[in-house]
């Protein structure tokens, strides 16, 4: 079922007005004495390039050691098997990056490449749309891998052209969008299927994910209004996805289309598709049948990413703290917050949740948080559509991204690119 609210946002660019307000709200000096809007024990006061990389302050010593081990794995470059250090071999055969931090730089937000440059923190999903089903491309699978280990062919290369678009507000303020056009070159295994669509995705920030995991299903679902029954002009729906471990249908929370129901699935799926790392969840290599040399290449075994490593990565990503709100008592900030609410931004970017009980971390349980998201899907219109459905998300629907930490992107990641493909700036 299609939603309508975000299409209205795109045509009447409330979406970009809301982002402008959030950028204003997130600038300025910290005022910790006045800080009361989000629990201090799950947030950190940092305005450096490490602002997204700190653990929540209330971790005990044992979990802090595991967090440090997880951070080491997150930043460590994997190598081709067999390697001198077996615990980090198994890269590829085809892949996009050789480390988690290669895409999620400083645990922050990725960006599209500059003209003529290779992808660094962006990937391209593939989906063959046939008879109302979403299938892998027969030659290239569900993601295009633009790199490969020695002796193996990469799958293809991406060329991006940008066409700058200006939008002028009624007050004459100008915002810029770069409309991207994608072309896949140097395909190694023949053309894409005629029904295959491509979807560009920049890497999202990874802090605060454990807190999102701790929000109860009921608290997310209660904001859904797919048919706009309350007549406020805003509609949104939640995504229901298949959990590959339990085989049950669960609420989607993570990813640009809310296509992952848990951080575990997000981690092992990304390790397999982005880096070519097998695990007990994905024991096979990420090679399609036509890629014979890829399938026959030497591997690091069926669990190149071990269960112990997965647990450390999971704890690391669950316990990354969110940046503390800044300048909360400033007059302009307060006025910006009032405007943010009055023009309807909070209809989708809901400011406040209280987490439920987290299954593994009491430190994340029953905390007041300020993510500025409803975690629902909204129709963002044909200009932002990728035509790639994901579970119950349609091609023109995207999950509302959390806006916490927005004002620190320029400090941490040295850019201000926004949206799923980084076209807004």
Annotate each predicted stretch with a short phrase:
Residues 25-425:
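Periplasmic c-type cytochrome electron-transfer domains
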Residues 1-10:
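N-terminal secretory signal peptides that target proteins for export/translocation
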